[in-house]
Curated annotation (Swiss-Prot):
Record's function text: May be involved in transcriptional regulation.
Domain (KRAB) ranges: 8-81
Zinc finger (C2H2-type): 215-237, 243-265, 271-293, 299-321, 327-349, 355-377, 383-405, 411-433, 439-461
Protein's name in the database: Zinc finger protein 525
Keywords for the protein's UniProt record, in alphabetical order: DNA-binding, Metal-binding, Nucleus, Repeat, Transcription, Transcription regulation, Zinc, Zinc-finger
UniProt keyword Cell membrane present: no
One biological process term in Gene Ontology: regulation of DNA-templated transcription
InterPro entries referenced in this protein's UniProt entry, alphabetically: KRAB, KRAB_dom_sf, Znf_C2H2_sf, Znf_C2H2_type
Source organism, top-level taxon: Eukaryota
Family assignment from sequence similarity: Belongs to the krueppel C2H2-type zinc-finger protein family.
Protein's organism: Homo sapiens (Human)
Xref: CDD domains: KRAB_A-box
Amino acid sequence: MALPQGLLTFRDVAIEFSQEEWKCLDPAQRTLYRDVMLENYRNLVSLGISSKCTMKEFSSTAQGNTEVIHTGTLQRHERHHIGDFSFQEIEKDIHNFEFQWQEDERNGHEAPMTKIKKLMGSTEQYDHRHAGNKPIKYQLGSSFHSHLSELHIFQPKGKINNQVEKSINDASSVSTAQRISCRPKTHISNNYGDNFLNYSLLTQRQEVRMREKSFQCIESGKAFNYSSLLRKHQIIHLGEKQYKCDVCDKVFIRKRYLARHRRCHTGEKPYKCNECGKSFSQMSSLTYHHRLHTGEKPYKCEECDKAFRHNSALQRHRRIHTGEKPHKCNECGKTFSQKSYLACHRSIHTGKKPYECEECDKAFSFKSNLESHRITHTGEKPYKCNDCGKTFSHMSTLTCHRRLHTGEKPYKCEECDEAFRFKSSLERHRRIHNGEKLYKCNECGKTFSQELSLTCHCRLHSGEKPCKCGECDKAYSFK
């Protein structure tokens, strides 16, 4: 009994975009589209299709987009027992085709197909016989004609309605390995936006994930659906860096990384905030900046529910709970939870204070201290108390001042339960309990627990009497 014949076209495994829709795709989506189309063709070949097809590619020119016609014939030779086919030449040409597309993308061509490749393949026909079984052969002939729509980068304006042309009668007589899955085509119209494009690509991506990952990296064992993805991954192991900066000779493994890096030299800041007009060199920086206006803090600590604008800030905060201090001083072995703390600590060993005031040349170990110091030159006092109208140079000073109005004393001694408005007052008080006397008189060697006590004591040696009576002008050493 003759096996059934059916009509198979490349449309059964293609997604089609109009020229306008293609322009909406970003480079990552175009790369995904290319990989999917090549994988579909590879699948047709791997199922036993003898192909002789010319894949003419196209490019954008000043006269417009050049249309290309793909013609060929796909004949499928299948048997009851599928033989061992030799597709090395086809696979080689497919890889060359992929490589040429990637090269054109790197060179900045809008439509990256620029050359003509011929994919030639032939299947070696074998007669397979089991004991007592006669060979069963049949041909599933199909006409493979593509007028730009078969690799389907572009399609004329208007709706695209691609109906499934494949029909197989008596499917029960065909084995599972001999069937090609027939799925409905997607209907695309111009009024569909990016959501549709993403959805159609997502559908293809979900299919890819269901397939076996047959391209495996020997170094790491990681597997990929496509050989092109494997080659990109292998660059990591090989140390191959293809894109070099002309200014500083720094090299990058991705073209987009180089483009982003070049903005450091050019000063280009293409991303602008609509709220305040501030510009940024990277989109991610603008995204973070927007959160200053919106107040959004999407990163939340699971331990204390504190929220942060940036993931890096959350990671640093988590070390408070874990006690992790990954940054170690090579001089003294002291460890710190944040890299900035280590950098400031190193100034103790080097004596270097990297943050210098332009007005008075005074230097500081911390950038925040320099910012606070600069206000002394400008006289700016931007922080105002709502209760009494007094203004302050620093927010921390205003916070402490407010406690005079509220009576709040948040700092409590663990020994005697006495409370204080300021942390410095608590630190001085603790010396009463532990007997610590940090301040020593250079004249007599007497020590004191507080700096004020030492200052008053020194007047006994100097004879200084700064406290003067307003009535009789008599002076005293102590107030």
